[in-house]
């Protein structure tokens, strides 16, 4: 069911993960155990329960500037050319394909703003998508506990965050100047993608690892179709591009790839 809905492959080795993420949820529903829960999500009236199940199973650990080498590479080797294009009237698009609670796309936006504070005046957009509508609501709100900002520099925190109170709790709110660069949309990576144009950069980190090998290969190939020559793909630390997509992605750094049609003639 999870596989057909979202491409997530859960074999016997993932049993402890499933138990840890669902057991409390099942108790909160007042159900007797996993058998009754499975009957619920498999029933014709179980669509909402299946969405809840996906939410619990796909919520991943995230933090600002996680795997910071990606943001350093973006800042030093990718953005200078893209920002020059934007200044010249060109279009720039970045996709955070599994954005979770927003810390990844906000990290991208903060990296961009560190180089070009007035980037919102140009045609420079970041799309952030996730399968979970609840986690997207958190992302859009952009209010985080102080502990989440441990990897944000003091200068960046001072410039782009403000202290607020949310339901009696102390939070740090992302500045609207950061938010306006990002559009959040719900998207299942296994479904049809509604995009008309290409992306200059795609971040898809620590998600494809949950797919089986055939599904992973399809996802890499679909990403390839959305990148222009020289476009960049950043993936998770345990992930590797596989299948036919290996012929069009050059590994240029730690889990960092550049799309190039020059590799089309290479043998596997």
Swiss-Prot record:
The keyword Membrane does not apply. It catalyses: L-glutamyl-[protein] + S-adenosyl-L-methionine = [protein]-L-glutamate 5-O-methyl ester + S-adenosyl-L-homocysteine. It comes from the Bacteria. Residues 1-262 form the CheR-type methyltransferase domain. Keywords: Methyltransferase, S-adenosyl-L-methionine, Transferase. S-adenosyl-L-methionine binds at residues 60, 62, 66, 104, 130, 188-189, 205-206. The keyword ATP-binding does not apply. One of its GO terms (molecular function) is protein-glutamate O-methyltransferase activity. Its EC number is 2.1.1.80. One of its GO terms (biological process) is methylation. Methylation of the membrane-bound methyl-accepting chemotaxis proteins (MCP) to form gamma-glutamyl methyl ester residues in MCP. This is Probable chemotaxis protein methyltransferase. The gene is cheRch1.
